[in-house]
């Protein structure tokens, strides 16, 4: 079986599927996914899921779906080094995630209330990681 080089932009589902197949060519000392420590996205958290209007369920949560403590604890100046080393470091405050979410919001027709809820969802996502992502997961 051929191995695929680890790509930090994979969705959590894609990562876990390839991981189960043993198809990922990981860098040395690559951290294992730990559901007790790693970020849970909306699919694992009813409170977050309830805040996402149906019209924006297509938001690429993969960007925000999986983070590891190695990256979470990494100072901003060090993050590019971790990225080059191909470690997992998904931060929900990542500009890419926010940009994707806002682009998606611009594309859909939401009522004023739904738009307000969607922006509240993005803000909650952002601060969840700032305060500590794993404690927002429903165990």
What is the meaning of each model-derived region?
Residues 1-139:
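Extended terminal accessory/targeting regions
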